[in-house]
Amino acid sequence: MSDTKSGDDKTLSVTPMKTLTLKRPGMEQGTVRQNFSHGRTKSVVVETKKRKFSLPGDKPEPAAAAPVPVFTPKPPVAAAPVVQEAPKAAPPPPPRAPVERSGMVLNELSRSEMEARRRALEGSKVREVEDRQRAAEEAKRRAEDEERRKREREESARRQAEEEARLQAEAESRRRAEEEARRRAPLAAELATADEEEEVKPKRAGAGAPVRRLVTPEVARPAKPTKGEEDRRRGKLTLNSALSDEDARARSLSSMRRRQEKFKRAMHNEPREKVMREVILPETITIQELAQRMSERAVDVVKFFMKQGQILKPGDVIDADTAELVATEFGHTVRRVAESDIEEGLFNIADNAEDLVPRPPVVTIMGHVDHGKTSLLDAIRNANVVSGEAGGITQHIGAYQVEKNGQKITFIDTPGHAAFTAMRARGAQATDIAILVVAADDSVMPQTIESISHAKAAGVPIIVAINKIDKHDADPQKVRSELLRHEVFVESMGGEVLDVEVSATKGTNLDKLLEAILLQAEILDLKANPDRTAEGVVIEAQLDKGRGPVATVLVQTGTLMPGDILVAGNEWGRVRALVNDRGEQIKEAPPAMPVEVLGLQGTPLAGDRFAVVNNEARAREITEYRQRLAREKAVAKHAGQRGSLEQMMSQLQTSGLKEFPLVIKGDVQGSIEAINAALDKLGTDEVRARIVHAGAGAITESDVSLAETSGAAIIGFNVRANVQARAAAAAAGIEIRYYSIIYNLVDDVKAALSGLLSPERRETFIGNAEILEIFDITKVGKIAGCRVTEGKVERGAGVRLIRDNVVIHEGTLKTLKRFKDEVSEVPGGQECGMAFQNYEDMRVGDIIECFRVEMVTRTL
């Protein structure tokens, strides 16, 4: 089949009648004759729609249709300045008509008229001032409006200039794209249906004039006939198949798609602008992840490291400093985050002032041991706590709440023994007011001074309670005078510290003490927000046999309720129950209330802060982070202490350090902490107590196995061993010792450490002897003839040979004779013969010093 265009045919012929139609602009109409097989032809009317393009240097063709209005940005027209019209002067008031005077004229005005005129005059003055102020404000407002309009005009001009620049840039990019598309489109794509021979004619007729054909990229290029085209037209030929042109080969969809993609690539071939990002960097990150966060290729990052002299792989881990350097080099900004950011928002959440309500004060009772702290608290609570403590000594932190006259006060009782320094420090940090109990008959003692230091370090006010004033030797004035030395100035001495003389046994002045506490609390203006998640501090923790881990906590803000998810130190759990100081289960714990919390997964450390979180996932993340941090610190500590095996052995040999291993189990965490601190103080350069394991809870079979492996002794403080542990200890021959008073425990460990000390070598002087003559006896050797000048000389004692006040030899006597008889000792003033063991270099005039050596057992 071939197509011929009838537009160039000049043969005279009769053409059939055509329909009268209007020619559309931009359309070229012609007739194409199609030749089929067997000599058949077919005429087809073809309309070619041309798209107009403007090339550089072309003259615009006259438009056939009405021109379409084109938007052209107009230059900004400066707004006419607003001229503020001056306020017109008020027209003068019309002249008043003369008032006709009556026949009777008063010589002077009345007092009421004078007052009315005076008020009118003052009112006019006030109105004048107000008018001037309004005029000034109006002028200021007009100036501000003018300045605002000026800024708006400048902003409008700037936006219009930016819009013009943007339009010019878009037009330039569009022009470049069209030129690129025109350059790449082949010239043959113009005629989709023209024959090859018909294409040559216009080229010849045009001589040298170039023929410009504009094509659009969207027009599909006609398929060239292939060799096998005639072979495909086989089979039975029908009239329908002969007259239809469905057998013509069409362009495939994939070819059209490839052409469109090629055109898009040509359009978007311009260089892209690099996007700068904010890269979030953790403490460690891999190179691959860093490249993804920067939207860069990992190969480029590896190349950067190669330029710096480092050969790394995309999977290698780098630190935050190196990652920040790389990100900055690639032009990105960096925001570093730490692993500890997971704890952000856990504590110290700010509360609104309108949400705060008054709360009870938290009072800590501090002082020296046996000064009556717990007895004073008993008198306030009308209970008996001392009888429950072993030896009458407080060994735990007790938290109680007392209600007096409708107002609640929370008391925290701390131990006064020297071993419980950490407990006193924790009590001072969790309190609002510190009550310093000083016995009137004992005055200021070391733990009293330490309690003062803890209270000052915590920044809490002090109330001095001078106890035991009922005793005959009580001297409260002496207590006040000694407190001055430690910068505690009571009111009677001209200071600001409140002091109350009380007697815990007789209940004297307890009301005054409570009034002083409430007065100090009113001055402090203690408030908290109960309508939020709870926060506080762990006062004590223990492992109860029937209830599991139990933590005594003090709620400082918020309200703690059963079901809350609690995070305390390295442990977390869901609150199963809340128990108050009287052993009753409660539904909620408001601020400043001490409660026992059940439901934790482990025993937290005393002094840890606790907080309530939203879900278990966050609680687990926080505790895992803290546990990992604690493990890393422990590993670093042991790594620094361990060193190599040779160094450790040489250090032990040179120092001669002996260790006493112990496995300690206690009832509460605070007692374990106090025992550890007390045993650490017993250590010296020669011996020390090494605590293999310390924990809260009963003694178990695993503790016995650990003690057997390490050769340690087992100590139980207010706990007992179960049946399996006792059987295992009896089989292994390990002694288990039980204690209820920390004094006895420390004394026994001190005695055991003293037994590890090597005995002390102590010398006792016996006497001196002077050598008068040297005798050389056959088969015996040299014998020194001496006279005892001081003390006496004993056989078997240690001797030193001194010449010119210098010790020449130290050894023992081989023989001691008087005349020819062996004697055990020679008194002073007598002569004798002496010989040394394995030494004969003696001279006349030497001094022989005799002494006795004793080995004395040492104690710590």
From Swiss-Prot:
Residues 503-505 are annotated as: G5. InterPro entries: EF-G-like_DII, EFTu-like_2, IF2_assoc_dom_bac, IF2_II, IF2_N, P-loop_NTPase, Small_GTP-bd, T_Tr_GTP-bd_dom. Pfam families: EF-G_D2 (PF22042), GTP_EFTU (PF00009), GTP_EFTU_D2 (PF03144), IF-2 (PF11987), IF2_assoc (PF08364), IF2_N (PF04760). Residues 467-470 are annotated as: G4. GO terms for cellular component: cytosol. It comes from the Bacteria. Residues 358-525 form the tr-type G domain. It is found in: Cytoplasm. Residues 367-374 are annotated as: G1. Keywords: Cytoplasm, GTP-binding, Initiation factor, Nucleotide-binding, Protein biosynthesis. Residues 392-396 are annotated as: G2. GO terms for molecular function: GTP binding; GTPase activity; guanosine tetraphosphate binding; translation initiation factor activity. Residues 1-11, 110-183 have a biased composition (Basic and acidic residues). Residues 1-265 are annotated as: Disordered. GTP binds at residues 367-374, 413-417, 467-470. Residues 79-88 have a biased composition (Low complexity). Residues 413-416 are annotated as: G3. NCBIfam families: IF-2 (TIGR00487), small_GTP (TIGR00231). Belongs to the TRAFAC class translation factor GTPase superfamily. Classic translation factor GTPase family. IF-2 subfamily. One of the essential components for the initiation of protein synthesis. Protects formylmethionyl-tRNA from spontaneous hydrolysis and promotes its binding to the 30S ribosomal subunits. Also involved in the hydrolysis of GTP during the formation of the 70S ribosomal complex. This is Translation initiation factor IF-2. It comes from Mesorhizobium japonicum (strain LMG 29417 / CECT 9101 / MAFF 303099).
